[in-house]
A protein has these predicted regions:
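Short, glycine-biased loop/turn motifs at secondary-structure junctions and
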Residues: 1-195
Length: 195
């Protein structure tokens, strides 16, 4: 497989696994190599964890590394193992440069959750979602309730994304990109939506 441009999250000091047995310091031009056997699991010393898109890195952070104040690095590496579309592993990874971290709003996290759940959702839920996305079904009380529940919904969405990532028609990068726009759901899933 050819070398790919990938993305890695570190803590605010450019480190991963702070204080652990796999503690690593990253920076521009730094390469690390996995020490475990190549047949080991992705989340182990056998593979160095990376992402194929910066938005996926940020959206998956709470259920993966859960780094506080993360930094985002562009990287180079050869993908040798995948967890669906959620993350990938390289035997060697080189961080190239520090990038601006995408800032994801609560509403964008909810849109990501919607995009992940849409393919398997009921028609009544899809109708409600179409109205929510268009702004038709957002009273002040609903907005307050949504804000209170949004973080939990986003966490559930990330878990749902993990479960659906192996589904053949699922494009996690397209969903993440769509979530940061105000485009209607039909641009992501071109099917008729009846509001």
């Amino acid at each position: 497989m050819a070398e790919a441009i990938l993305y890695k999250l570190t803590d605010s000091e450019g480190q991963t696994h702070g204080g652990g047995t796999n503690h690593t310091q990253w920076g521009a031009g730094i390469t690390h190599e996995a020490k475990g056997p190549a047949d080991g699991p992705l989340c182990s010393a056998s593979w160095i964890h990376a992402y194929e898109h910066p938005l996926v890195a940020v959206l998956m952070n709470p259920i993966h590394a859960n780094l506080k104040n993360p930094q985002l690095w562009s990287c180079r590496g050869e993908i040798g193992k995948r967890d669906g579309q959620l993350k990938c592993g390289c035997r060697a990874l080189t961080t190239v440069e520090l990038l601006p971290l995408p800032q994801i709003t609560t509403e964008q996290r909810v849109r990501f959750a919607i995009g992940c759940a849409w393919p398997r959702a009921s028609e009544s839920w899809k109708k409600w979602v179409a109205n929510w996305l268009s702004g038709k079904d957002r009273t002040a009380a609903e907005a307050a309730a949504e804000a209170a529940a949004a973080e939990e919904a986003a966490r559930a969405a990330r878990a749902a994304a993990a479960a659906w990532a192996a589904w053949a028609g699922f494009d996690l990068i397209a969903i993440a990109e769509w979530a940061t726009t105000e485009k209607p759901i039909e641009t992501l899933y071109p099917v008729e939506v009846k509001p």
